[in-house]
């Protein structure tokens, strides 16, 4: 991953600086999240863009058609620049690094919450307050995931901290405790 960071960080940093100068940082970060979700959900798109068979001009035309009305002009320029430099295959890593730099700059902690079932808005708000207290931060971004294997409850990952309040985790800990006793 360090080699990939060596490639992606300059693009992410430069794009963040451009967005700051144009006062559109929050907007481009939201767009980056949307484009990243599309990129990850559509392997055909990412595969075609990474393909050496497809010519650069065709890639740029496709990017123009797909994203012209969806992203800022500076974001579209980043996409075309990555295509020009044969780096569009690492777009996901560039956008992830951009979002990471944005969070660092704004002191936003990232928490991944995996629950057994969908959480209501009320549960999410209560969980956000508790996780903010545990993470000791004013700003928190929560990434929600569903994993029915947890049976019930949830698991929270914030930085290096893990809070396992799942039924599966309790069963595992009970099994370990019983194994020690016998």
From Swiss-Prot:
Keyword Metal-binding: no
Compartments, as annotated in UniProt: Cellular thylakoid membrane
GO molecular function: proton-transporting ATP synthase activity, rotational mechanism
Domain of life: Bacteria
InterPro entries: ATP_synth_OSCP/delta_N_sf (IPR026015), ATPase_OSCP/d_CS (IPR020781), ATPase_OSCP/dsu (IPR000711)
GO CC annotation terms, alphabetical: plasma membrane-derived thylakoid membrane; proton-transporting ATP synthase complex
Keywords assigned: ATP synthesis, CF(1), Hydrogen ion transport, Ion transport, Membrane, Thylakoid, Transport
Pfam family membership, one: OSCP
PANTHER family registered for this protein in UniProt: ATP SYNTHASE DELTA CHAIN
UniProt function note: F(1)F(0) ATP synthase produces ATP from ADP in the presence of a proton or sodium gradient. F-type ATPases consist of two structural domains, F(1) containing the extramembraneous catalytic core and F(0) containing the membrane proton channel, linked together by a central stalk and a peripheral stalk. During catalysis, ATP synthesis in the catalytic domain of F(1) is coupled via a rotary mechanism of the central stalk subunits to proton translocation. This protein is part of the stalk that links CF(0) to CF(1). It either transmits conformational changes from CF(0) to CF(1) or is implicated in proton conduction.
Official protein name in the record: ATP synthase subunit delta
Lineage: Bacteria, Bacillati, Cyanobacteriota, Cyanophyceae, Synechococcales
Gene (name only): atpH
């Amino acid at each position: 991953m360090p080699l990939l960071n060596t490639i992606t960080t300059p693009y992410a940093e430069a794009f963040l600086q451009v967005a700051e100068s144009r006062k559109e940082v929050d907007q481009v970060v939201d767009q980056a999240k949307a484009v990243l979700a599309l990129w990850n959900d559509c392997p055909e798109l990412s595969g075609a863009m990474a393909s050496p068979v497809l010519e650069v001009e065709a890639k740029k035309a496709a990017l123009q058609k797909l994203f012209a009305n969806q992203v800022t002009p500076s974001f579209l320029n980043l996409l075309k620049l990555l295509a020009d430099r044969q780096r569009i295959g690492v777009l996901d890593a560039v956008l992830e690094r951009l979002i990471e730099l944005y969070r660092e700059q704004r002191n936003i902690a990232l928490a991944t919450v995996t629950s057994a079932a969908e959480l209501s808005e009320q549960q999410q708000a209560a969980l956000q307050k508790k996780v903010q207290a545990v993470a000791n931060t004013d700003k928190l971004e929560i990434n929600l995931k569903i994993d029915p294997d947890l049976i019930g409850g949830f698991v929270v990952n914030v930085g290096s901290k893990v809070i396992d309040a799942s039924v599966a985790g309790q069963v595992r800990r009970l099994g370990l405790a019983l194994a020690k006793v016998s």
